[in-house]
UniProtKB/Swiss-Prot annotation:
GO terms for cellular component: cytosolic large ribosomal subunit; extracellular matrix. Keywords: Ribonucleoprotein, Ribosomal protein. It comes from Dictyostelium discoideum (Social amoeba). This is Large ribosomal subunit protein uL2. GO terms for biological process: cytoplasmic translation. Residues 211-235 are annotated as: Disordered. Belongs to the universal ribosomal protein uL2 family. GO terms for molecular function: RNA binding; structural constituent of ribosome. Pfam families: Ribosomal_L2, Ribosomal_L2_C.
Length: 255
């Protein structure tokens, strides 16, 4: 009988495959949409720029005045390039066009670089949140209340003109261009994420450890496609693949 393979151990969600999340600072998100943001703006100040383990982009701790006296509203935002401690951040319909401010995308001119864009009104930011990412406003349709934006992938998407976005590019760009240089850095990088590293290839294992293992030289020896309803210990390689082989031709992006 074969051993339990790596894919089965991942599904068990043991400590080896679980992300080390106890050091994380929190979920970065916009303020909950309220009357003040819909009709005017609210003013906050950046208290500190912090590192969040497992995330490439730095975070900014922003403090707004609370709804009641002597109470502060502390928020965690994804920091754009150029944001600094002591900077004032304005969020709302009548905020100025400055890096770090949060406005409805319908109020921003075409060609504006934005990040942390709401996909749906009130979801507090869902698109263009990774380090160095940004989206671009392509056009507005005031009749339908829709704005067309260009996503980091290059594709275009229509979102509500009332959806909010932060002006600027997410900080930390070029992070992946810096080489690791040693295995220890890769170890610590993957340790805080839910990834297993280093990953041993199946053909390098013994036949008792993996369906691709064994042989007088490293080769699979059979087709790597598997059925959707195969048992867990057999589902490796290309699972329920519609097609195999190289992708030929160019990808057409609809305007």
């Amino acid at each position: 009988m074969g051993r339990i393979i790596r894919a089965q151990r991942k599904g068990k969600a043991g400590s080896v495959f679980g992300a080390h999340t106890h050091h994380r600072k929190g979920t970065p998100r916009f303020r909950a949409l309220d009357y003040a943001e819909r009709q005017g703006y609210v003013k906050g100040v950046v208290k500190e720029i912090i590192h969040d383990p497992g995330r490439g982009a730095p975070l900014a701790r922003v403090v707004f005045k609370g709804l009641t006296q002597f109470k502060l509203d502390k928020q965690l935002f994804i920091a754009p390039e150029g944001m600094h401690t002591g900077q004032f951040v304005f969020a709302g319909k009548k905020a100025t066009l400055t890096i770090g401010n949060i406005l409805p995308i319908g109020k921003l001119p075409e060609g504006t670089i934005i990040c942390n864009v709401e996909e749906k009104l009130g979801d507090c930011g869902a698109v263009a949140r990774c380090s160095g990412n940004y989206a671009t406003i392509v056009s507005h349709n005031p009749d339908e209340g829709v704005t067309r934006i260009k996503l980091p992938s290059g594709s275009k998407k229509n979102v509500s003109s009332l959806a909010r976005a932060m002006i600027g590019i997410v900080a930390g760009g070029g992070r992946i261009d810096k080489p690791m240089l040693k295995a220890g850095r890769a170890f610590h990088k993957y340790r805080v994420k839910k990834n297993n590293w280093p990953k041993v290839r199946g053909v390098a294992m013994n036949p008792v450890e993996h369906p691709h293992g064994g042989g007088n030289h490293q080769h699979v020896g059979h087709a790597t496609t598997t059925k959707r309803d195969d048992p867990a210990g057999k589902k490796v390689g290309l699972i329920a693949a519609r097609r195999t082989g190289r992708l030929r031709g160019t990808k057409n992006i609809s305007e």
